[in-house]
């Protein structure tokens, strides 16, 4: 009966006697056992001092246990886990209706994203020729809807049409029929992205970047066009460089093949549209937008190889007729570009250097410190902006993989130095390939690439160059999602010399929830970290589609006050207010 004993006598009278306690020796006894009870009380009083000592020991043990409560000690990244149903308690039973008639899952229409994704399949390319009508839910429906002349006139009065496009009724002009999101976020240039002096002094391009025609579209293995069995039926097209008249890149144009790995037609479309959005002065950009882009998009949507190649040839002819000096003068004046331009440019480099040998990145032990994973460009752009990474800053990536984060920080933010350290041999080899291709492509597009440095096939632990640069870093990236406790301790030791104001990006909190200031860690830099948790959006990392969480820790001059509040320490990652109870 939970610490109590039930005793029955011959008279069927029942008595309840409490088990001996450290703090209480109360009991209920019968008159018959009065003498026996008196002896028990005397014995209890004689051991009172011993019981008091035991009580203090137990209390100390409980305090120590609470100090290392698992709630405060460690926590899984909650964002990557499935949320519980908070509406009602799950009894584990499946409703009969749901058991007999399973729920219907709606099919998503990915047709409008076929161009913006470089890994689209052929079945997503074609679309009906019917006019598009925007539904209330924001999706595009292909159906014919009669519109009266009065409705057209009213619409014109409410919203003026774009100049030169007033009388066009073709669905080609809609934003959903473009390769690039024309309404996407823009990137304010913090430094001169284009190297004007280089462009003015070099009219001939002498680099040899990897050609698109050497890549497979449905296999990560490299090959040449002549190695395919059906090369005779493949149509090819050459795309004119917008800055160097002597350079043209050859592409395979084949809408019948799978483009699961690489889509050359989509890449052509993006490059032509970026010519309009970034490189060309206004008069030429409008001409390209009105004359060539509609036919280019329509031929892609209809899988019209002949029309697509014809649009490319018209583009090439137009580019050759534009004075090169006009383009250079325009590039000198621009102060913002589409953010996707940097992402797509880096993807072109990635497909040439990393894709053909991507299988090498799978050579690692599962769930170890050496697991390979990538942070995707959109997330990097967001977090660089949050950290206010800017021109002249020093950026470091501890565990840089193939160097994606390093080169994006260099191009997007204009860092004075972008540094990466990688220990794995295969990833280090691919880093060199990607960096060499990046340098060639930057020259081809007239882009400035600031100082980039790698420490390859070396650990960042006991690394002299890392130790030398840590005090200079403004932003440090540590993808510690699968770091074990031992490596996290070494990272803590490495970061001790970080300067005030340095921001550290991580996928798990650098400072354990059990961390406390004591006599032995008074000088630890973790005492001065202001740790902020953020929600990670979907499609931010390569190993999962789901969202999650990430942290930005800022090195402060003074001690973080939350370390002195147990309540604040407990809710540091929960974001809940303090609740006081009796």
Swiss-Prot record:
Amino acids binding S-adenosyl-L-methionine: 372-375, 395-404, 422, 459-460
Effect noted on mutating residue 422 to A: Abolishes S-adenosyl-L-methionine binding and methyltransferase activity
EC number: 2.1.1.360
Comp. bias intervals (Basic residues): 104-117, 124-146
Enzyme class name: transferase
Description of how activity is regulated: Ubiquitination of histone H2B by the RAD6/UBC2-BRE1 complex to form H2BK123ub1 is required for efficient DOT1 methyltransferase activity on histone H3. Interaction with DNA is required for optimal histone methyltransferase activity.
Keywords: Chromatin regulator, DNA-binding, Methyltransferase, Nucleus, Phosphoprotein, Repeat, S-adenosyl-L-methionine, Transcription, Transcription regulation, Transferase
Protein's job: Histone methyltransferase that specifically trimethylates histone H3 to form H3K79me3. This methylation is required for telomere silencing and for the pachytene checkpoint during the meiotic cell cycle by allowing the recruitment of RAD9 to double strand breaks. Nucleosomes are preferred as substrate compared to free histones. Can bind to DNA (in vitro).
UniProt protein name: Histone-lysine N-methyltransferase, H3 lysine-79 specific
Gene from which the chain derives: DOT1
């Amino acid at each position: 009966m939970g610490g109590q004993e039930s005793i029955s006598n011959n008279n069927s009278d029942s008595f309840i006697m409490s088990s001996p306690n450290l703090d209480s020796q109360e009991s209920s006894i019968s008159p018959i056992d009065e003498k026996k009870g008196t002896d028990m009380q005397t014995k209890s009083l004689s051991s009172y001092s011993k019981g008091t000592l035991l009580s203090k020991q137990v209390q100390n043990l409980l305090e120590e246990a609470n100090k290392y409560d698992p709630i405060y000690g460690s926590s899984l990244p909650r964002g990557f886990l499935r949320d519980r149903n908070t509406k009602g308690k799950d009894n584990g039973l499946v409703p009969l209706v749901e058991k007999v008639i399973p729920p219907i899952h709606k099919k998503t229409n990915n047709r409008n994203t076929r161009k913006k994704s470089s890994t689209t399949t052929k079945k997503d390319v074609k679309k009906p020729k019917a006019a598009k009508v925007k539904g209330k839910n924001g999706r595009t429906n292909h159906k014919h809807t009669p519109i009266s002349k009065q409705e057209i006139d009213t619409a014109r009065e409410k919203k003026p049409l774009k100049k030169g496009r007033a009388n066009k009724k073709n669905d080609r002009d809609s934003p959903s029929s473009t390769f690039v999101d024309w309404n996407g976020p823009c990137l304010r240039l913090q430094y001169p992205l284009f190297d004007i002096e280089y462009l003015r002094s070099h009219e001939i391009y002498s680099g040899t970047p990897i050609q698109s025609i050497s890549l497979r579209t449905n296999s990560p293995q490299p090959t040449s066009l002549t190695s395919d069995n059906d090369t005779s039926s493949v149509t090819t097209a050459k795309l004119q460089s917008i800055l160097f008249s002597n350079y043209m890149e050859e592409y395979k144009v084949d809408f019948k093949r799978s483009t699961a790995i690489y889509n050359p037609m989509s890449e052509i479309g993006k490059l032509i549209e970026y010519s309009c959005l970034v490189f060309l002065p206004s008069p030429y950009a409008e001409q390209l937008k009105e004359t060539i882009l509609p036919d280019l998009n329509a031929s892609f949507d209809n899988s019209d190889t002949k029309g697509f190649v014809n649009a490319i040839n018209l583009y090439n002819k137009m580019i050759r007729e534009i004075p090169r000096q006009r383009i250079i003068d325009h590039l000198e004046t621009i102060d913002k570009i589409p953010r996707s331009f940097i992402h797509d440019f880096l993807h072109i480099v990635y497909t040439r250097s990393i894709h053909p040998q991507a299988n090498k990145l799978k050579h690692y032990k599962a769930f170890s410190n050496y697991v390979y994973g990538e942070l995707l460009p959109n997330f990097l752009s967001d977090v660089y902006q949050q950290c206010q990474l800017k021109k002249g800053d020093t950026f470091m990536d501890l565990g840089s993989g193939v160097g994606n984060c390093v080169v994006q920080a260099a191009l997007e933010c204009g860092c004075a130095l972008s540094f990466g350290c990688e220990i794995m041999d295969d990833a280090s080899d691919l880093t060199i390939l990607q960096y060499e291709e990046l340098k060639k492509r930057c020259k081809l597009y007239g882009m400035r690439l600031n100082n980039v440095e790698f420490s390859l096939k070396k650990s960042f632990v006991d690394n002299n160059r890392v130790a030398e640069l840590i005090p200079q870093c403004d932003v440090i990236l540590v993808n510690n999602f699968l770091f074990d406790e031992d490596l996290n301790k070494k990272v803590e030791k490495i970061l001790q010399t970080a300067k005030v104001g340095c921001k550290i990006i991580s996928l798990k909190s650098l400072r354990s929830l059990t961390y406390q200031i004591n006599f032995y860690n008074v000088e630890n830099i973790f005492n001065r970290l202001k740790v902020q948790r953020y929600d990670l959006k979907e499609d931010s990392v390569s190993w999962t589609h789901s969202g999650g969480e990430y942290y930005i820790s800022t090195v402060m001059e003074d001690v973080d006050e939350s370390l002195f509040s147990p309540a604040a320490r407990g809710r540091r990652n929960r974001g809940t207010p303090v609740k006081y109870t009796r």
